[in-house]
Amino acid sequence: EVYNSLIFNEDENNPMFIRLKELIDEIFNNKDNDEYVKNIIFKDNIEEYNKLRKIHYRKEEVYKLKKVLSDNSPYVIEFTGTPRTGKTSLINNLKDFFKKKGFVVEILEEFTTSEKYKKEIYPTLKYKYKNVVNTEIPKYVLKQLEESVERKPDIIIIDRSLFDRLIWVDRLYLKNGMSENEYSEYKKLYIPLIKNKIDIIISTYTDSLTSLKRDYNANLSLEKRSFLNETNLNEYNESLLNMKKLSEEENINFNLFDTTNKNQREISFEVVDCLLKDMRQNLLNKAYKEFDFK
């Protein structure tokens, strides 16, 4: 009956007919749009179109894998790295990339630049020792992450979280602001939490001078920057590279992308390639466990 209705248009009001027609229209509309994007938008850059098409279908594969699993725990991504390496643009790009497919994506802003931190947290910490600031802040960052996980989005993208705090604590330790024992205890507490709660860490990197040049070229002011100077950037980068080494020792899923001689588009492709590979493997591991594959 539904088949005849579909073929001969005998019952346009049949709910199943309406739904089937919607699905067919969607298929043809998507095809038309695909041809338009390929032949009009990317007419002069088919190579770019083909690269985008590949990651598009890899994203679809990940989406389908996600939907067949009963495990609905979020995939957690932390972004960290040298200032002025395109981190914020990457986060926004990835949010758009995944949301357009239908993933529920939650973005957690950098805690220490948030209004909550400035108005509620910082006033209670500003007169305390630096090591207290660097050990108290992670507690709030952890709470922020745990609250997001409870809301069960598909993907959580965090702008500087527990791993980034580890970088700052390493910097503090190197500047003699923390004892060796305090530093050791901090790592003992937070490294397991990082491994347990964050699926992947994406770090963007460049040298201090390139970072400064980018800042001056992106803004109109010539005044001296409050934090962004070569000394502070070199100290941050030293600790960032220390944590890269620590990640290798502790088996933390840390991925560094050097942006010095690459544009934003190149880094975007590299990062999304890394994420899709890791997400796919993450979901396959869950599938093997759930369906008891041998």
Model-inferred region functions:
Residues 84:
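Walker A (P-loop) phosphate-binding loop of P-loop NTPases
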Residues 2-60, 65-67, 216-294:
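NTP-dependent small-molecule kinase module
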Residues 87:
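Conserved lysine of the Walker
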Residues 168-241:
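A glycine- and Lys/Arg-enriched "phosphate-lid" helix/loop adjacent to the NTP-binding pocket
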Residues 133-192:
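Glycine-rich phosphate-binding loop used to anchor ATP phosphates in small-molecule kinases
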Residues 79:
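Hydrophobic anchor at the beta1->P-loop junction of P-loop NTPases
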Residues 96-140:
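Conserved substrate/cofactor phosphate-moiety recognition/catalytic segment
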Residues 90:
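Hydrophobic positions on the alpha1 helix immediately C-terminal to the Walker A/P-loop
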